[in-house]
Structure formats: C-alpha cells, structure tokens
Amino acid sequence: MSGITAALVKELRERTGAGMMECKKALVEANGDIELAIDNMRKSGQAKAAKKAGRVAAEGIILAEVAADGKFGALVELNCETDFVAKDAGFIAFGKDVMAAVLADKTDDIEALKAKFEDARTALVAKIGENINIRRVAILEGEELGTYLHGARIGVLVAAKGANEELIKHIAMHVAASKPEYVRPEDVPADVVEHEHQIQMDIAMQSGKPREIAEKMVTGRMNKFTGEISLTGQHFVMDPSKTVGDLLKENNAEIINFVRFEVGEGIEKVEADFAAEVAAMSK
C-alpha cells in the first residue's frame, strides 16, 4: 500500500463505482497509476466506463461574452479561495475588466493578461485577503457566436454557421450539461480511439467468441463510444429522441467549435492528513 493513499482509493471509487477493496487491489497492481487501474478494472469487468478526472477544488467564476460585432467571443476563468469571495462585487468587477481587455485586444495570451492586471490583482488580494488568479482564457471567432452561463461556475462558448441565436443557445446549454469533448465523432483523436478499441477487444475476447465476432461487437461499441463523447453524436438534452447532429441537420446548421469551462476543473485540492497534523501539534 506504499504510495496508495486513502484519497487515491476514494477517487478511484468515485470514478468507477467499485468497492473499496477492489479499488485498493487495482491500485496496488497498477503501482498507484489510477488510469492504468481503471483500464485493468474495465477489462476484468469490475468497472464500466469510468468518469473523467476533474475534481472541482477551486472557487471562482466563469465569464462569457461575445464582442459587439458578434464575430469574436471569449471565456475567462478567475479563481479565488472561497465561495464567499467568488460573490464579492470587487472580485466580479475585476473579472469584467479582464474580459473587457480580452475582447478589446482579441487575445488569449494568458501571461500577457496576467502581467497587464498584476497591479490590480495585487491590490485586490490585499483588500480581500485571498489569493486571486486569472487561470485561463479561450477565444473563438466565427460567423455566429453564442454563450451560456450556468450560474457563474460553468460557461460555454459556441461558434456556429447557419444557426440562429436560439439554436446556438440551446446547443450551448447542451454542452454545459453533457460535457462533449469533441464536435464530431470523426474528430476524436486516433490515440484515444486506439486506446478504447484495445480495451473493448480485451473485454470482447473474454466472452470466448471467435475473433471475427468479437471484432464486430467492438465496432458497434466504438461507434457508441465516439458518439457519446462528441457533440453531434450525443442525444440532445432537450429532446433525447434525436441527436444534436439530427437537430443541426433539421436546421441546416453547423457547429464549427465550442469551448466549455467549469470552475476549478482539473485543479486537485491538497487534502491535509488530519491525524498527522494532530500528531505533529502534540510533539
């Protein structure tokens, strides 16, 4: 169990739905590599498709806006330490100033933005008493752009062609809810497809069926896999009887690209070992 922390076991349980002992065993066999442990658990049938990593640990806000000309849009993530500060008027105003600069300069150069706003950030940190960070910026250009904010924690920016404002808004809401990773199934990178294909072949071969039958089974599973992680292949949240691709076809529209930000995604919270803290304090 050296190097296999309780936090790692907990994360594996949350991502796979498997029991604690199965997760411990899988992590030991994978030498603490959680992604390898998930692959092995899927191959052995202990876990189905696992949830993506991305524990939300930071607080903050997402800002989303399209420029006045309608041809340029941006998302900005601004982080702080507590939910209380995320609602502070000064913090929100600082975020709006950053967004205004992004739209004015038409830039996603995060380092240049940080340098530009460092004095203002430092002053705000001194006033509020929490660290503040301009974490990331994304920009899109296109004929038709639209945004959607779910609270201030999830933001989506969509670039489309041949779509009206309402359709773009509905697509953006779908992206917020369903978290697609790519626009179309054919956009899924070859290495991602190959990785999943190998897992599915290992699972299919365990059924004892001939290889050619297993390959046919896997073809169907792979079509499902690429469809589920791509926008056009997903069932539309507002009408699951059709896919987003069907909806776009009905409206003679096309999605060029999209970006989805969620506050803190990918930032892992450093969890203190409470027992160790108490022991240290008693020395």
Curated annotation (Swiss-Prot):
Q: What is this protein called?
A: Elongation factor Ts
Q: Does the keyword Protein biosynthesis apply?
A: yes
A cellular component term, taken from the record's GO annotations: cytoplasm
Where is this gene product found? Cytoplasm
Organism of this sequence: Proteus mirabilis (strain HI4320)
- Where it mainly occurs, coarsely classed, is cytoplasm
Q: Which residues form a coiled coil?
A: none
Superkingdom, natural source = Bacteria
